[in-house]
């Protein structure tokens, strides 16, 4: 009765090497796969956030450009009202917008600084806008002095300058809208691949 046999494992016991192998297979491997999965998910999420920030940045540029172009139109409208009526109150939109347009163009150049083509377009906008300022200031001076402002206006010089400003704004906006579309498509693609991958 009660004989103890040494050296033989008891039924249902496992040696420590075999236990560690089973433990690593059933615990460590899923843990590693889970950690890699989390790392990939975090990477995809970070990239998606980056792409969405680029879309938002481009939208901000488009919005600011539209506002600046509107100010340019306000200046033209104010000038026209003053030339027709001689009423100085028509110049208030011109004066207010003129001060803001230059600052807005500087800000836009900073927003697109990483894209030299867009910076060049904004420089052309600035150049065309400065030429229009010279024309507008000449017309204002002539109107205030009761001089002949009709002949220079009738020559179409102001319209040509205004059309130049509008064309440059249009080209700039088209490039930004194309970029926004590309970035939006990239974001959609990242979302699609993320969903498919998981």
For every predicted segment, state its role.
Residues 23-75, 112-129, 152, 183, ...:
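Amphipathic alpha-helical segments and their boundaries
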Residues 71, 82, 91-179:
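Heptad-repeat alpha-helical coiled-coil/4-helix-bundle sensor or tether segments in soluble regions
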Residues 11-19, 42-56, 76, 136-198:
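Juxtamembrane amphipathic/coiled-coil helical coupling segments that flank
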Residues 1-32, 193-194:
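Positive-inside N-terminal membrane-insertion signal
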Residues 86-88:
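Short loop-to-helix capping motifs
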